[in-house]
């Protein structure tokens, strides 16, 4: 038998974002002698845990924007033009004013990923690649049979299937250790539906990263509302029913997640050509590499000098290490 005609059966364990990108890349490759089998324990492909109701409510947002997402078959700013109207209305998204540099509601992003998965599977069919999807199938065991170069996948209903290859795309997993044993203790805030309750006492949050922000958004929505005051600042108004409610973050470093901004110009300085000679000279003296101190001076501080002379005066004589210490002290003070 011609080896080029042999079909390689590939199992994908998990049908979330990782599986989506694996399928997209496999199907977009030159090889068509593959057969894909996708096992997903939920009833939806694409969204996974972070972008479905298992890991998000309406108030939760992504930590990436459209312009940062690795390429799929169509970008979000195109997909919003064909997205269901009820979905757009639900999240108050207008396709005509969609901004690809802004973060998105996670559940909205999950719907996009699911739609992209459908397109990837449709593309596979046009190439003659079979894709089998097993929704609501929980994989409980994977056996590597090295003597036969096979992998046996067992699902919860005690069904065994044999494949040539197996790719693990299981994504997030939140083990339970103390949850259920200690009253009112949660090992993680997921699914967020378990936090959709009210408290009239302080709530401790261990950590101050993006996961903590998810908790804050969920609890804030349940215990009050956000409004703009007379000066246009957004303020949180706690419900009078829960006057003793408050959130207390416990953090090892005392820092909240860094604020993300979008620069209208991807490069702070446009003076590339006249600096080329300096770059080449620095590489000559550093075995082909650029000195970090050189990059800090030329690519960062020189641009600051051009854009913000007053701030440049503060950092003009500081090394990269000095600058980091200055900024960290400033950030700690703000936090």
Protein language model annotation of sequence segments:
Residues 1-6:
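Basic/polar N-terminal segments that are highly enriched at the extreme N-terminus
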Residues 7, 12, 17, 21-36, ...:
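Rossmann-like dinucleotide-binding core of oxidoreductases
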Residues 120-133, 242-244:
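A short helix-to-beta-strand connector/capping loop
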Residues 135-149:
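A conserved short coil-to-beta-strand element within the FAD-binding core of flavoproteins
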Residues 150-155:
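Generic recognition of long tandem-repeat/solenoid scaffolds
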Residues 50-126, 138-140, 262, 267-335:
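N-terminal FAD-binding dinucleotide-binding subdomain shared by FAD-dependent oxidases/monooxygenases
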Residues 118-124, 144, 218-227:
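Short regulatory "switch" loops immediately downstream of catalytic or recognition motifs
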Residues 156-165:
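Core beta-strand elements of the Rossmann-like FAD/NAD(P) dinucleotide-binding domain
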């Amino acid at each position: 038998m011609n080896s080029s005609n042999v079909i390689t059966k590939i199992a994908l364990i998990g049908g979330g974002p990782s599986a989506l990108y694996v399928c997209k890349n496999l199907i977009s490759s030159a090889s068509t002698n593959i057969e894909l089998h996708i096992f997903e324990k939920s009833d939806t492909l694409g969204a996974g845990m972070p972008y479905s109701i298992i890991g998000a409510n309406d108030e939760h947002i992504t930590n990436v924007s459209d312009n940062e997402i690795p390429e799929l078959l169509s970008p979000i700013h195109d997909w919003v033009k064909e997205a269901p109207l009820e979905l757009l209305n639900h999240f108050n998204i207008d396709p005509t004013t969609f901004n690809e540099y802004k973060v998105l509601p996670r559940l909205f992003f999950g719907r996009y990923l699911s739609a992209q998965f459908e397109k990837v599977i449709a593309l596979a069919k046009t190439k003659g690649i079979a894709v089998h999807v097993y929704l609501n199938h929980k994989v409980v065991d994977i056996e590597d049979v090295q003597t036969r170069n096979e992998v046996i996948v067992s699902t919860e209903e005690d069904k065994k299937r044999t494949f040539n290859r197996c790719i693990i795309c299981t994504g997030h997993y939140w083990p339970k250790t103390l949850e259920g044993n200690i009253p009112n203790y949660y090992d993680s805030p997921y699914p967020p539906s378990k936090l959709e309750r009210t408290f009239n006492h302080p709530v401790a949050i261990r950590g101050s990263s993006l996961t903590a922000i998810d908790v804050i958004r969920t609890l804030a929505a349940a215990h009050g509302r956000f409004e703009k005051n007379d000066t246009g600042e957004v303020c949180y108004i706690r419900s009078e029913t829960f006057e003793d409610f408050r959130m207390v973050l416990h953090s090892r470093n005392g820092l909240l997640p860094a604020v993300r901004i979008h620069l209208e110009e991807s490069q702070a300085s446009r003076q590339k050509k006249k600096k080329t000679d300096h770059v080449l000279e620095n590489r000559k003296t550093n075995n082909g590499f650029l000195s970090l101190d050189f990059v800090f001076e030329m690519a960062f501080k020189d641009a600051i000098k051009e854009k913000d002379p007053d701030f440049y005066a503060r950092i003009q004589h500081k090394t990269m290490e000095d600058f980091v210490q200055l900024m960290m002290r400033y950030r700690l003070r703000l936090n």
